[in-house]
């Protein structure tokens, strides 16, 4: 079952949030940098009464990410695990995957080649 909750389109970054079988899927398109980090952070912040946050971030549409994006993902991971939930990354483009691996983010946050694999865990 899939429900679309919201869409955020501020400038070069667009974010859509859906729910697939009880898992929040945040689909991101564009560039994640210092100008868009706050928008991404807001999209990844779980509702206070949302229970265990289970989130997959679909990065297939992200063409660029700098350290600002890495920091947002780390904060979202810490928030999710602190609430007995989890965060997974899905379908990063090669340039984003290179950064994720370079900084070791894939050793902290599970990174899957497809959205379907991330949903299955």
Model-predicted regions and their roles:
Residues 113-121:
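A charged, well-structured terminal subsegment
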Residues 20-21, 60, 116:
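Conserved catalytic submotifs in the C-terminal HATPase_c
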Residues 2-42:
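STAS-typified acidic loop motif
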């Amino acid at each position: 079952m899939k429900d679309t909750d919201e869409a955020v389109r501020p400038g070069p970054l667009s974010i859509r949030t859906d729910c697939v079988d009880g898992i929040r899927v945040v689909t991101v398109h564009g560039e994640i940098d210092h100008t868009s980090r706050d928008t991404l952070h807001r999209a990844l912040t779980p509702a206070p009464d949302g229970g265990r946050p289970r989130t997959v971030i679909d990065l297939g549409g992200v063409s660029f990410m700098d350290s600002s994006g890495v920091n947002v993902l780390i904060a979202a991971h810490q928030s999710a695990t602190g609430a007995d939930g989890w965060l997974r990354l899905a379908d990063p483009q090669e340039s984003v995957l290179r950064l994720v691996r370079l900084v070791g983010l894939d050793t902290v946050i599970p990174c899957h080649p497809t959205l379907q694999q991330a949903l299955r865990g």
